[in-house]
Amino acid sequence: MAADRAQNLQDTFLNHVRKTKTPLTIFLVNGVKLQGIVTWFDNFCLLLRRDGHSQLVYKHAISTIMPGAPIQLFEGGEDASA
């Protein structure tokens, strides 16, 4: 059940930033910093676009994703996971 929730949170987050075209900074596990907008994703990878160029990024290589602007995924107060 926890794995299902984590997957749903990941999909919800990625779908939100894709639909709103929120600029992201993505850090890979090797320290490389990527920036761009998510245009597509699946269970294993995402497509990141910047300056008219697209990069296919494998999710297993991603360490951290930081949105360029605050996002609100769920309605409610401070602890929406309860």
UniProtKB/Swiss-Prot annotation:
Q: Which residues are listed as membrane-spanning?
A: none
Cysteines joined through disulfide linkages: none
Keyword RNA-binding present in the record's keywords: the answer is yes
Q: Which GO terms describe its biological process?
A: regulation of DNA-templated transcription; regulation of RNA stability; regulation of translation, ncRNA-mediated
Against Pfam families, the record matches this protein to: Hfq
Q: Which SUPFAM superfamilies match?
A: Sm-like ribonucleoproteins
Q: Mind telling me which CDD domains this protein's record contains?
A: Hfq
Give the UniProt keywords, A-Z: RNA-binding, Stress response
Q: Does the keyword Glycoprotein apply?
A: no
The GO terms describing molecular function are:
RNA binding
A cellular-component GO term for this protein = cytosol
Per UniProt, residues of the Sm domain are 11-71
Homology family: Belongs to the Hfq family.
The record's note on quaternary structure and interaction partners says: Homohexamer.
Q: What does this protein do?
A: RNA chaperone that binds small regulatory RNA (sRNAs) and mRNAs to facilitate mRNA translational regulation in response to envelope stress, environmental stress and changes in metabolite concentrations. Also binds with high specificity to tRNAs.
This chain belongs to the protein called RNA-binding protein Hfq
Native species:
Bradyrhizobium sp. (strain ORS 278)
